[in-house]
Amino acid sequence: MSSTALKSGKISAYAAVKVDPDGDYCTPGAFDLERLFWKGSPKYTHVNEVWPNLYIGDEKTALDRYSLEKAGFTHILNAAHGRWNVDTGPEYYSDMNIEYHGVEADDLPTFNLSPFFYSAAEFIHTALQNETSKILVHCAMGRSRSAALVLAYLMIYKNMTVVDAIDQVLQHRCILPNRGFLKQLRELDIKLALERRDNMNGTNSSEKTGTSTETEI
């Protein structure tokens, strides 16, 4: 990806992008991101710990109040909140010592999950500030919506690239965010890379590029 394209803010979703010309890392294109999931992952199970005290699970896990309490979960992030999805809400856990956060998202490539990246990541980060906390991030299958939000958390708060975040989670769980979510995570990767570069240079990314990045579908 040329510097001209990066400065214009128009970025092809299928081209690799190198934000730091002096660095080795390139944000992969959308197809290359999908290929990361081809190398295999653990057999699908209902719930897995993918980072210390951070778990990704499915609807069955979220509905099993007894097992949640027995396992010591203190926080739940439902990435499929809403009447037509996994309709739990804070009321479902009202008599339990569980803090709930809901994201009403559809598992569709056309759904824009990115507005929820930072709020969901903050919820996870705040929960994990207490070393006794355990957080479950779930959707219906625990593979796409919930996985995308956990990947965003690792990128935002743990300074991982999208590639590193995917590798981290794939070591522990079978995930496959839909192509639309992968494109949005790719945009986040570029944004965070710009911020890291400009923090090192003492400049503001929006001032340097003149605009925000926008992926061409």
Swiss-Prot record:
Question: What SUPFAM superfamilies does the database record attribute to this sequence?
Answer: (Phosphotyrosine protein) phosphatases II
Q: Which residues form the Tyrosine-protein phosphatase domain?
A: 46-194
In the Enzyme Commission scheme, what number(s) does this protein have?
A: 3.1.3.16, 3.1.3.48
Instruction: Supply the Pfam families for this chain.
Output: DSPc (PF00782)
Q: Which GO terms describe its molecular function?
A: MAP kinase phosphatase activity; protein serine/threonine phosphatase activity; protein tyrosine phosphatase activity; protein tyrosine/serine/threonine phosphatase activity
Q: Does the keyword Cytoplasm apply?
A: yes
One biological process term from GO is: negative regulation of MAPK cascade
Alphabetized, the UniProt keywords read: Cytoplasm, Hydrolase, Nucleus, Protein phosphatase
Q: Where does it sit, as one GO cellular component term? A: cytoplasm
**Positions annotated to bind substrate:** 138-145
What are the subcellular locations of this protein? Answer: Cytoplasm; Nucleus
Main location (coarse class):
cytoplasm
Q: Where is the active site?
A: 139
Q: Which reaction does it catalyse?
A: O-phospho-L-tyrosyl-[protein] + H2O = L-tyrosyl-[protein] + phosphate; O-phospho-L-seryl-[protein] + H2O = L-seryl-[protein] + phosphate; O-phospho-L-threonyl-[protein] + H2O = L-threonyl-[protein] + phosphate
PANTHER family xrefs: AGAP008228-PA, DUAL SPECIFICITY PHOSPHATASE 29
Family according to the record? Belongs to the protein-tyrosine phosphatase family. Non-receptor class dual specificity subfamily.
| Protein function | Dual specificity phosphatase able to dephosphorylate phosphotyrosine, phosphoserine and phosphothreonine residues within the same substrate, with a preference for phosphotyrosine as a substrate. Involved in the modulation of AMPK and MAPK1/2 signaling pathways.
Return the protein name.
Dual specificity phosphatase 29
Biological classification of the source = Eukaryota, Metazoa, Chordata, Craniata, Vertebrata
